[in-house]
């Protein structure tokens, strides 16, 4: 997207002008720094908050039912009763109280018997991905990932000069046969594969879930080839109907690093997540985390712990699941009403996203400008793959938007998509 294609904030314009001006300090950047880039999600953030636009772009949780009064009371109580501790340095692993709470949350997901001594509190699960890349990957190493996968993880791995190799999915998630084939191909080429990064439950961006019968098979394949599994599960507790699907980590404590987050089940603003790390890997993982942040925010840790202890968070999550189920249903119905017959889309059973596929030959990145003109924002599919090739796919987020806005956003987007499909068919 160029500055001519949309209005830029003054801050963004200044940054672009600064980037255009050559400076002698440019020569000081490391090779790694040249691999750092802003995600497509952040690219459209300033645009998506413009008045009048319906944003189906950002995967933000709904906070409308969060009891802000209780959050305020909890924060006040933490400051009044434990202020000196809350405003001071803490341990690099995170507080024991929060790590114990995290183990209770993971037990609800199906990870039983996890020890707080194996948990590292991180600055969101994004930080856990960064630590994993730092600890395990050398430049040129390979990380396997679902195709498509989370754009933030792609940016993290690429910043460490890691080669991300996509593995295909179908409606039941990562395909084990394709995983085996990709591993064999890369090993035959002499590549070193360190990690499989996977979002098995309600994948971002596709909303697809790895079938229960495939989960152990995927871990077994990785174990056979000495590949660690990095399981990112921020949406695991947000299955619309029924209990969460058992994480890969549950039966594989030595082969899976499990990443969780409070961003989707409580608040992204507290910037707290965690990694459950195999015992034999824990020390180096923890030290790498400590080297960057020294310690997670004591105030935020104590706020989250105290809030969850004084609040029925299980009931709150049940209500949240109902909210997301309603919003997902609104989006699916609107897509059926306003999108052309040539378009297909996923039908998620949880999470935040629907993944739309248009006919081959349609490039959804140029469509973004037309969608903005029509009053709606989405994320083009090319953002979710390491390839720079055009993509006929796009991600729509229903999580942070009320049903009536979802319907209006899809209604606005429908003619844009229909025109692109018709032009492609000529």
Locations of the language-model features?
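Conserved glycine-rich beta-strand-loop-beta hairpin in the small C-terminal domain of fold type I
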Residues: 305, 322-332, 343-357, 367
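Conserved core of the PLP fold type I
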Residues: 80, 84-225, 230, 236-257, ...
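A non-catalytic, amphipathic alpha-helix used as a structural packing/dimerization or gating element
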Residues: 97, 284-287, 318-330, 408, ...
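PLP-dependent enzyme catalytic core of the Aspartate aminotransferase-like
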Residues: 2-14, 373, 387-426
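Conserved core segment of the aminotransferase class I/II
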Residues: 254-322
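Conserved C-terminal alpha-helix-loop-beta "cap" of PLP-dependent enzymes
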Residues: 282, 286, 356-395, 403, ...
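N-terminal small-domain helix-loop-helix segment of the aminotransferase-like
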Residues: 18-21, 32-124, 131, 309-310, ...
């Amino acid at each position: 997207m160029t500055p001519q294609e949309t209005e830029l904030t003054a801050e963004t314009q200044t940054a672009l002008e600064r980037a255009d001006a050559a400076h002698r300090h440019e020569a000081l950047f490391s090779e790694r720094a040249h691999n750092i880039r802003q995600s497509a999600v952040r690219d459209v953030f300033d645009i998506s908050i413009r008045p009048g636009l319906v944003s189906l772009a950002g995967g933000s949780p709904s906070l409308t039912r969060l009891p802000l009064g209780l959050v305020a009371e909890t924060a006040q109580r933490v400051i009044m009763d434990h202020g000196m501790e809350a405003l001071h340095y803490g341990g690099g692993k995170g507080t024991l109280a929060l790590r114990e709470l995290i183990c209770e949350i993971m037990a609800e997901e199906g990870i039983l018997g996890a020890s707080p001594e194996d948990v590292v509190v991180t600055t969101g699960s994004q930080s856990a991905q960064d630590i994993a890349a730092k600890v395990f990957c050398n430049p040129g190493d390979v990380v396997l990932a679902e195709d498509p996968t989370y754009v933030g993880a792609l940016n993290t791995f690429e910043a460490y000069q890691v080669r991300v190799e996509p593995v295909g999915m179908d409606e039941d998630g990562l395909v084990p046969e394709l995983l085996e084939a990709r591993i064999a191909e890369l090993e035959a080429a002499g590549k070193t594969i360190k990690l499989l990064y996977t979002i098995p439950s309600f994948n971002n961006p596709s909303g697809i879930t790895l079938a229960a019968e495939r989960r152990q098979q995927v871990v077994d394949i990785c174990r056979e080839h000495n590949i660690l599994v990095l399981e990112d599960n921020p949406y695991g507790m947000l299955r619309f109907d029924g209990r969460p699907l058992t994480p890969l980590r549950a039966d594989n404590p030595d082969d899976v690093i499990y990443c969780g987050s409070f961003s989707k089940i409580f608040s992204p603003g507290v910037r707290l997540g965690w990694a459950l790390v195999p015992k034999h890997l824990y020390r180096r993982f923890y030290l790498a985390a400590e080297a960057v942040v020294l310690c997670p925010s004591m105030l935020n840790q104590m706020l989250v712990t105290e809030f969850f202890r004084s609040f029925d968070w299980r009931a709150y999550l049940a209500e949240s699941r109902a909210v997301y189920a309603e919003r997902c249903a609104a989006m699916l119905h609107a897509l059926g009403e306003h999108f052309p017959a040539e378009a297909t889309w996923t039908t998620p059973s949880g999470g935040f996203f629907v993944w739309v596929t248009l006919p081959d030959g349609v490039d959804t990145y140029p469509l973004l400008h037309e969608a903005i003109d029509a009053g709606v924002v989405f994320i083009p599919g090319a953002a979710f793959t390491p390839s720079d090739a055009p993509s006929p796919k796009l991600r729509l987020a229903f999580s942070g938007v009320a049903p009536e806005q979802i319907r209006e956003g899809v209604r606005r987007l429908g003619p844009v998509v229909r025109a692109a499909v018709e032009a492609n068919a000529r």
